[in-house]
Amino acid sequence: MKKYRLPKNKRLLLACLLFVSMGSMAQTIEKWYINMPDILNPTLSKQNRMELLEYHKAGQGDSIANLFKHQAYLLKFDTLNQHITVKNTPSSTFEMKILNQPDSTVIIGIIRTVCAPVCMSTIEFYDTAWHSIPLRFTMPTAIEWVDINKIPTEKIDLQWVKNLMGVSFVSLSFSDKDQTIQAKNNTLDFLSEVDRKVIAPYVSDKNLSFKLKDRTWQRNQ
């Protein structure tokens, strides 16, 4: 039986496609972190980022001086779950995670958290060409942690509670176990000791969890 062979030009095209595909698959959290545009992480240069990871891998430490001469610390470097967290400055943290999708596309998630002194986060998503992806994530508000039904309305005014929790301080993080986002309510840290004592019994200390579905991050119930 005569074997069929692809024309030479088609074989070359197929080889190129395979090469590009393999190159994309070979990219790791380390490569994405080091080679990201500096504007996304202006506190540490590309050289800083590379040296920070190289020192860690060589067992020579987990810190390096940032561009402002403060120490930056590597808090997490998980190559298995494609997750990295760096304390860029004494009051700010940078977190990156690779989110592999069922259709083989790759999403790069970035969380920036600033504690001044109460912690708050922002979150962004990028494709592998570092174009911003408009995935919808609605930051939860502090009132979502309050169990309104348990508040004794004869003693505590509900409108006072809503006003008190009207300013939200929420920090985000990527889960180590799966591709979810965890939201932590830090608003109690912003309140006076008197107000905190009144409202704290009705505020959950559990994180809220969000998963990606149809380009929207939805809260897990």
Name each model feature, range by range.
Residues 85-86, 113-119, 196-201:
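Short consensus segments that form the blades of beta-propeller domains
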Residues 136-212, 220-221:
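Short aromatic loop motif centered on NTY/YTY
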Residues 97-117, 183-186:
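Exposed beta-strand-loop-beta-strand "reactive/processing" segments of non-cytosolic proteins
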Residues 27-99:
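Terminal domain-start segments
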Residues 74-83, 127-136, 213:
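Surface-exposed loop/turn elements that mediate protein-protein interactions on large endomembrane-trafficking
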